[in-house]
Regions:
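Bacterial N-terminal signal peptides that target proteins for export
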Residues: 2-11
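Bacterial Sec-dependent signal peptides at the C-terminal "C-region" and cleavage site
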Residues: 16-32
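Conserved catalytic region of serine esterases and O-acyltransferases that act on ester linkages
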Residues: 26-27, 236-313
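Acidic/histidine-rich, surface-exposed loop or edge segments in extracytoplasmic proteins
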Residues: 47-55, 125-136, 280
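Alpha-helical cap/lid subdomain in secreted, periplasmic
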Residues: 113-249, 261
């Protein structure tokens, strides 16, 4: 009887924690570094073209960035769909009883497809996910590692050949810890240490989840342009942003290049820099010299990081 009461009490505690959005205590320990490194020891074979992509996230994906990826991909792409929200967590995209803030507004376009339905369909060669900002709150309250694991497992169950990607974003420019400082620290301590390594520690997770290191690319570009000002239209970090957190068209172009390079395992150097937004209007194009710098930096960064799956230079 006592054991039964303990089991009931534990179950009740877990329900209360979930209802309050508080962290659970049963999260797996991060996959040890030797096993984690082994998953990425060999570059992944290139997926055959054309590739169909599905995006899950929020306004740091938005409508325009996937449209830019599709234009950069050209005949290598086979279309894309998405489910978005305002600051939406992966948990809200998975759980039917957890609301996705801004759902009606963000998904009022022809590229919308329900997230659970999409990954279960087996229709996609690449599934790209990101987590809400602030990443520390997502880890603490939204069980990010678990929902990354759930979406990845569902994707592979429907299409064993599909690739799963985790898109590293950033935090507000005004972050008191320092914008560049946090990008340097957060990749290891949060994106990989608390999310990817815990997701891959779940039972049955024997395949890598690949990283789209947009934050690292942005930090590298910002360091270069702020150390050597004078590039037309790109002199400091604010030239990539429309506000404290969201990107302007130049910033979106940089992130789209990063997605292209990782998913296609191909250099973005020489790609077009004058693209359209999702609504068909011309995006504000970077200066050709700035675009060439972006393309070079993207390729150097993704080649230098084994978690991207891209072969090293």
């Amino acid at each position: 009887m006592l054991d039964r009461l303990k089991m009931r009490s534990s179950a009740l505690v877990m329900l209360v924690l979930a209802g309050l959005g508080l962290p659970r205590c049963d999260r797996p320990a991060p996959l040890d570094m030797a096993a984690y490194d082994a998953l990425y020891a060999d570059p992944v074979p290139v997926l055959p073209d054309p590739k169909r992509i599905y995006f899950i996230g929020h306004s740091l994906i938005g409508r325009d960035m996937p449209a830019m990826v599709a234009q950069l991909s050209g005949a290598r792409g086979a279309g894309y769909e998405s489910q978005l929200g305002w600051g939406a967590s992966l948990k809200s995209h998975w759980e039917p009883d957890v609301p996705v803030n801004g759902f009606e507004v963000e998904n009022a376009h022809p590229r919308y497809r329900d997230a659970r339905e999409a990954v279960a369909s087996g229709d996609y060669d690449a599934v790209v996910m990101t987590e809400m900002v602030e990443i520390r709150d997502a880890i603490k309250y939204m069980e990010t590692h678990d929902y990354l694991h759930r979406f990845a497992a569902a994707t592979w169950a429907a299409n064993p050949e599909a690739r799963v990607y985790f898109y590293e974003t950033w935090h507000p420019l005004s972050d008191p810890e320092g914008w560049l400082e946090r990008i340097d620290l957060d990749l290891g301590r949060y994106w990989e240490g608390e999310i990817m390594r815990r997701a891959l520690a779940h039972d049955g997770m024997t395949r890598p989840i690949y990283l789209i290191p947009a934050g690292q690319v942005m930090a590298r570009l910002v360091r270069e342009i702020e150390a050597s000002p004078g590039l037309p239209g790109l002199t400091d970090r604010t030239d990539l942003f429309s506000d404290d957190i969201h990107l302007n068209d130049q910033g979106l172009y940089l992130v789209a290049l990063t997605h292209f390079a990782v998913i296609h395992q191909s250099s973005p150097e020489g790609l077009p820099h004058a693209l359209l937004r999702a609504d068909g209007t011309p995006a504000d194009a970077p200066d050709p010299t700035a675009a060439a710098l972006m393309q070079r930096i993207v390729w150097e960064v993704v080649q230098s990081m084994p978690r991207t799956g891209v072969p090293p230079a």
